[in-house]
Amino acid sequence: MYSISLVVNMQCISAYGSILSLPLRSNLFSVRKLSSFPHKSFSGQHGKLVRMKATPTRACHDQESNRKFKRLPLSKWGHHFLSAQVDVSEMNALAQEIERLKPEVGEMLMFSSKSIESTKKRILFIYMLVSLGVAFHFEDEIEQSLEEGFEKIQEMIAGEDDLYTISIMFWVFRTYGYNMSTDVFKRFKGENEKFMESITSDVKGMVSLYEAAHLRTTREDILEEALSFTTRNLESLARAGASSPHILMRIRNALCMPQHYNAEMIFAREYISFYEQEEDHNKMLLRFAKINFKFLQLNWIQELKTLTKWWKQQDLASKLPPYFRDRLIECYLFAIMIYFEPQFSLGRVSLAKINTVFTLVDDTCDRYGNVSEVAALVQCVERWDPDCMDSLPDYMKTVFKFAWNTFEECENAGIMEEGLSYDVQGALEEWEQGDVVPTFDEYLEIGGVEVTMYVSIACSFLGLGQSSREQAYKWLKSRPKFVEAQAKRARLMNDIAGFEGDMSRGFDVNAIMYYMKQYKVTEEETFTRLQKMARDLDTTVNEEILKTTKSVPRQILKRAIDFGKMIEFTYRSGEEYTHPEGRFKDHITSLFVDLIRL
């Protein structure tokens, strides 16, 4: 969804050879090919290759049939935010109260006692700060507390048999990159080596164990068991409806989207409502969380007003056929998932604009352009020269101008002094020879590079300062296993969610099709296996995060992690970006329309 499509590239290879690539560069980007990035060599011992002649698809038909595109749902939001009114005096008052309450909350975190019980309470309090969406105010204090706490981990867990406490401590330490051992959960098993049924009566403990289980790494069987055990029991509780309403909502939200995968502010909106209904909630902490959230909401609404005005000025609807997805607000929601904090306003707005460019280019290639037009557009973007537009049809000139102007805006705003360029040319050359369809594993490697991290995550770093961006790009260029696993997982989720749409448009360049052809299995069995493969990649991602924490600054690693959450959010219940009903609409409403009540 964020790039010139691999589908079109592969369709065009036999006709156009190596000119087809995945560029992302303007004069502000240094010219770097993907071939300059270390590539894993494909094994000389391939699985069985599937050889076939290239067959024309809808994108390769004549001009008339190629223009038979499916009209997608219009934006539900239109110019809604253009008329939004934000009271600046209210924002100033909220900012002042945040600054007044912040030291008091900080004292609750950093109280002087260094006893084991106090340290334990501090870790539990960190979970509250994260869940309520205010942890970014106290990152230094949190890191200090966790570093001190992890040194005392054995003392803290000794004799501790409260499921909630153990699970929350595990979640917090793992989330911040501290590799707390899973052995701590053995105390909740009986003589039969299974989790004791008695713990099912501790509903909050069960939810916390469920959340902790999603931070499992490879070969952590006890957490696999915990996930199965808690999922089964929580689903039963949700069906029975016997708990209090706010507990039931917490269970259902967790089953729908575990906290580990959820966007920080989406989870915070839900958790604030949950925490308010807890009898033992801290009134001052709750007020701080609410004031902070409303302040963020007003900032976001201001930015959406600016973005909506910008989008209206582009007037793409009058310049292009209605083949593309009008998803400005959804693009901004994605940006919120990467950068929600007030200080990242410029990066957030720029990222939202860039997301609209990627969406338009992707739809142009996937849904409307024919092979020769796409090839011409790719060449033009590769050269990044407005003079080359003469070779483009009129509608593609509009697409190129929009991309050019948007990147120029970001450059002029000072958000893109340095960047990366990616080109799939080298990776695709092996596929060009002899009409050979790549093996499933080869497709996953190159497909993952193309559609997810190695382009989109580079743009996700744009909100960081220049020195941090340079460090982030250097890390990304090393092709870390964490990003590689995220990319493969995203490729699988994208292809699983988009399979029916791909087939309806005649595109068979899809992980499901490659797997079925290579391994001679049914579509149903393929879906089952690939879904398991995606789950297994979860554990690899978690493991690599723990390995990477000490070598990569948290502000860089967090953007990559949050990008993975964005992918999870988009595809967990289908291709919701294309059809943004349900959760997309609900979350946009809760974040940008319904202001939190103080």
UniProtKB/Swiss-Prot annotation:
Cross-referenced InterPro entries: Isoprenoid_synthase_dom_sf (IPR008949), Terpene_cyclase-like_1_C (IPR034741), Terpene_cyclase_plant_C1 (IPR044814), Terpene_synth_N (IPR001906), Terpene_synth_N_sf (IPR036965), Terpene_synthase-like (IPR050148), Terpene_synthase_metal-bd (IPR005630), Terpenoid_cyclase/PrenylTrfase (IPR008930)
EC number(s) stated in the UniProt entry for this protein: 4.2.3.-
Family: Belongs to the terpene synthase family. Tpsa subfamily.
Pfam family, one: Terpene_synth
Gene Ontology annotations for the cellular component aspect, listed alphabetically: cytoplasm
This protein's name: Terpenoid synthase 1
UniProt cross-references to CDD domains, sorted A to Z: Terpene_cyclase_plant_C1 (cd00684)
Origin: domain of life: Eukaryota
Positions bound to Mg(2+) 2: 362, 366
Pathway: Secondary metabolite biosynthesis; terpenoid biosynthesis
First-listed, main subcellular location of the protein, grouped into a coarse class: cytoplasm
Chain's gene name: TPS01
An annotated GO BP: terpene biosynthetic process
